[in-house]
């Protein structure tokens, strides 16, 4: 029989860190800390499978699960000496989510569960502090009404702010017991008026309401969005943790906080974190009050005049420091820890591997290798490949005179410039229109996740380094400044009030997430140097990986950038991109509109020196590294004007009648150009195009070899081949031109002719095509289109719906479909090598920079992946991780 509930407490636990898939990250680590003998409030964890059962039961909690939870609560009662629902020494509970990977702020929590009109009196009596009891009760009502009953926070906050204004209070901590009791009555009245029901007084009703709400939050809009952004499977579900409450709001000897064993922004080996006196944990995480530094060094560096925990609570600080060191050594990774101090006693509420900036991840991994804590291979595995994008963020030029209009905390490194927007929705709209924006919020909430993802940067006027905005921005690699108390956001009038300046929506600002500064206007930036810790990690990765990493580059500038990122060749040069530039488009149109072959050849003679110059530049930059050049691929109509205005403009420039040009454009029109007259089909229809391109390639190879002294071995790729006979025809053209150029130059040129495998038929007939092809490069963009029968340009109309409804887990145009497209690649690779055992195999679609797709390429033995220049470091790291993981 399935066990639904696992207990922990009093130094014993029924699970541990190894059980994170079943117990979720929070539950597994609570059990682990308990078994280590650390001070953990007793509790129980409902396994994540129960979440899926909850959904399959139509949102009903199983009776057997209820029975196991009741038994678990009885065990908590035995340890604490308190009783759930009792009017004497009542046991209060927290109910928290716990997915197997951290999803900060995306799911729901309920604290102080078990309070009602009677137990609040008992709690006040036991604690000797009626104010604390009523404060806890109002927190519970507000949280429960929001999470379980669906009544948002705003109305409650409005009541509280009105009451504080009437009483002349600025802070929540200034309210007395009687005043909190009145707030509670107002909260309960609001619930009755808005929902037509009373706030539940039965603790068990409260319990099952909270458990159901936590399960339900797994499918909340914000959680679904977060999982899609971070590729977390829908089917995992969340565990639920029910734990005895400990209180950080029991006066000035109590506190709550979050600590990192190392700095999550810089990676510095020093305790780092924030705390609030007389508060509960949600106050820190939600950014409702700006917290104080845990350490004295942290206080001094932030310029705060608020006392640190190190000075204010020295005994608790010493114990926290000891536990942090123990946990980091136990888990062999930087830890993110939540704690509460209840009247001087420290309690550990959570530990997990902390989210960190990529720069911090690099430093922590390198330092831990130097400290002999982890191996070089483990260090390589510690870096999320896609997070390397963070290192490519520009930084503000240090020579620039900064006009600082606000300062805050440096929550996520990098700099960003954009127009001010005040809502997440505006950020999403701006991204869709191609505009760069900075999202301004007093504090972000999980509902802002879509806007945070769309923005170039994030600025909040409240919150600390562990607030929602800070944690999420670091995870996304978005520059972020939080707690900018020198600024004020006027939400109603859409204004930002800074130091000596008032800005409105649409005005440009720059934020420096590394320095915590807000600057007026656009500021010059510089690209970072990828050295130091990055260089060491990538060096270890390069030693470990088997596959080479090439780049998709069409210009010498792209090639230079890619080489600086470690590219070992060009896996795809799209020659058609060269024809769209400047005057070339006019010559290309002249060729297309020519009446006969003679006219086409005259135009191609003009294009030849242009192409030769392009290829010479690429060969020179790559200095003997392999360069794969794809012959002209798109249909000819793509080079022609489309609208009547464009037709008139082009006709005038070319000395043609608009009507004649329109007729030629219409004649070239295709109903389905993706599957039409393109690729090798164009080459066969107009072999003179192939002849020109081949001559440009070989003449450029001669020129570059003379210039660099390095042998140039062009790899010429024929696109959209489905038949061996197609490749034979085009290859014969290429070979003939190669012979002519070699004779003219008086030198031998080594070269390869291969094909893109981008049609299912080509994959299935790879053993036959390999008789003529010397290499295969899998064009995964078109292979995905032709395998699924989905146009990539139209997929956005329904792929997100498919993901949301669980039809597919990932967008197949972003991460390779292993079962279908991947199977075709495997078949083609095996059959191709059966014919030609030394055949070179690679991929050159967008998937070449996707870590999951790269792991697949390693598994089936491809020789290289090729991706855009800025994804080369990602591919290098992912290729290494694929080898290391396979060998572990």
Regions found by a protein language model. Name each.
Residues 423-425, 486-487, 535-538, 554-556:
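Intrinsically disordered, low-complexity regulatory segments
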Residues 241, 421, 438-440, 459, ...:
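Structural motif
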């Amino acid at each position: 029989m399935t066990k639904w509930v696992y207990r922990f407490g009093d130094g014993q636990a029924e699970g541990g860190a190894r059980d994170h898939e079943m117990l979720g990250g929070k539950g597994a680590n609570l059990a682990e800390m308990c078994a280590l003998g650390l001070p953990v409030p007793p509790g129980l964890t409902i396994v994540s499978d129960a979440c899926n059962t909850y959904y399959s039961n139509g949102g009903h909690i199983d009776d057997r699960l209820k029975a196991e939870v009741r038994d678990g609560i009885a065990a908590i009662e035995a340890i604490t000496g308190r009783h759930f629902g009792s009017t004497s020494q009542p046991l209060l509970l927290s109910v928290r989510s716990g997915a197997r990977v951290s999803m900060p702020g995306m799911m729901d929590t309920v604290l102080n569960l078990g309070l009602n009109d009677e137990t609040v009196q008992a709690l006040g009596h036991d604690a000797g502090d009626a104010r604390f009891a009523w404060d806890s009760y109002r927190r519970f009502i507000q949280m429960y009404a929001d999470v379980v009953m669906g009544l948002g926070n705003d109305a409650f906050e409005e009541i509280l702010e009105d009451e504080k204004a009437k009483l002349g209070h600025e802070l929540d901590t200034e309210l007395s017991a009687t005043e909190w009791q009145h707030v509670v009555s107002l909260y309960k009245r609001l619930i009755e008026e808005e929902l037509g029901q009373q706030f539940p007084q039965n603790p068990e009703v409260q319990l099952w309401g909270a458990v159901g709400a936590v399960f339900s939050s797994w499918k909340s809009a914000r959680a679904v969005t977060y999982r899609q952004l971070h590729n977390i499977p829908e089917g995992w579900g969340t565990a639920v943790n029910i734990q005895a409450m400990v209180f950080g709001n029991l006066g000035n000897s109590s506190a709550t906080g979050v600590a990192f064993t190392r700095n999550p922004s810089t990676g510095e080996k020093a305790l780092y974190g924030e705390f609030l006196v007389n508060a509960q944990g949600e106050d820190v995480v939600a950014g409702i009050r700006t917290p104080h530094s845990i350490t004295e060094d942290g206080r001094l560096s932030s310029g705060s005049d608020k006392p640190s925990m190190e000075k204010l609570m020295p005994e608790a600080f010493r114990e926290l420091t000891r536990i942090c060191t123990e946990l980091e050594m136990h888990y062999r990774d930087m830890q993110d820890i939540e704690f509460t101090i209840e009247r001087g006693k420290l309690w550990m509420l959570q530990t997990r591997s902390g989210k960190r900036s990529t720069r911090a991840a690099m430093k922590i991994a390198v330092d831990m290798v130097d400290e002999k804590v982890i191996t070089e291979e483990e260090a390589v595995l510690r870096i999320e490949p896609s997070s390397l994008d963070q290192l490519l963020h520009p930084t503000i030029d240090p020579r620039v005179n900064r006009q600082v209009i606000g300062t805050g905390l440096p929550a996520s490194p990098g700099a960003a410039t954009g127009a001010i927007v005040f809502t997440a929705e505006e950020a999403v709209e701006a991204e869709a229109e191609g505009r760069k924006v900075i999202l301004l919020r007093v504090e972000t909430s999980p509902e802002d996740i879509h806007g945070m993802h769309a923005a170039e940067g994030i600025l909040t006027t409240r919150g600390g380094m562990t607030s929602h905005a800070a944690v999420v921005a670091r995870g996304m690699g978005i520059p972020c400044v939080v707690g900018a108390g020198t600024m004020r956001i006027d939400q109603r009038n859409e204004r930002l009030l800074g130091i000596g300046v008032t800005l409105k929506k649409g005005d440009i600002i720059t934020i420096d997430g590394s320095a915590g500064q807000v600057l007026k206007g656009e500021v010059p930036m510089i690209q970072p140097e990828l050295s130091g810790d990055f260089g060491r990690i990538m060096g270890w990765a390069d030693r470990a990986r088997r596959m080479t990493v090439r780049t998709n580059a069409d210009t010498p500038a792209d090639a230079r950038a890619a080489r600086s990122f470690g590219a070992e060749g060009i896996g795809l040069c799209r020659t058609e991109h060269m024809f769209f530039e400047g005057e070339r488009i006019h010559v290309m149109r002249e060729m297309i509109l020519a009446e006969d072959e003679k006219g086409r050849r005259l135009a191609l003679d003009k294009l030849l020196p242009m192409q030769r110059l392009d290829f010479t530049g690429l060969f020179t930059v790559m200095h003997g590294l392999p360069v794969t050049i794809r012959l002209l691929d798109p249909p000819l109509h793509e080079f022609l004007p489309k609208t009547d205005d464009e037709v008139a403009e082009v006709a005038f420039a070319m000395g043609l009648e608009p009507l004649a040009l329109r007729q030629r454009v219409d004649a070239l029109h295709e109903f389905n150009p993706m599957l039409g007259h393109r690729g090798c089909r164009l080459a066969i229809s107009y072999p003179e195009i192939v002849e020109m391109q081949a001559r440009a390639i070989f003449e450029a190879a001669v020129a570059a070899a003379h210039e660099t002294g390095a042998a140039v071995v062009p790899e010429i790729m024929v696109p959209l081949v489905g038949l061996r006979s197609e490749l034979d025809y085009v290859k014969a053209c290429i070979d003939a031109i190669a012979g002519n150029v070699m004779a003219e130059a008086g030198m031998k040129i080594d070269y390869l002719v291969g094909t893109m495998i981008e049609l299912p038929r080509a994959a299935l007939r790879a053993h036959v095509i390999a008789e003529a092809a010397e290499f295969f490069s899998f064009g995964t963009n078109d292979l995905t289109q032709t395998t699924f029968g989905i146009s990539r340009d139209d997929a956005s109309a329904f792929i997100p719906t498919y993901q949301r409804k669980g039809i597919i887990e990932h967008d197949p145009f972003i991460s390779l479909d292993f079962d279908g497209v991947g199977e075709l690649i495997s078949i083609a690779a095996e059959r191709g090598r059966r014919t030609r055992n030394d055949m070179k195999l690679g991929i050159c679609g967008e998937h070449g920079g996707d870590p999951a797709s790269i792991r697949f390429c390693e598994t089936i033995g491809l020789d290289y992946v090729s991706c855009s220049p800025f994804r080369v470091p990602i591919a290098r790291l992912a290729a290494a991780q694929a080898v290391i993981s396979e060998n572990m």
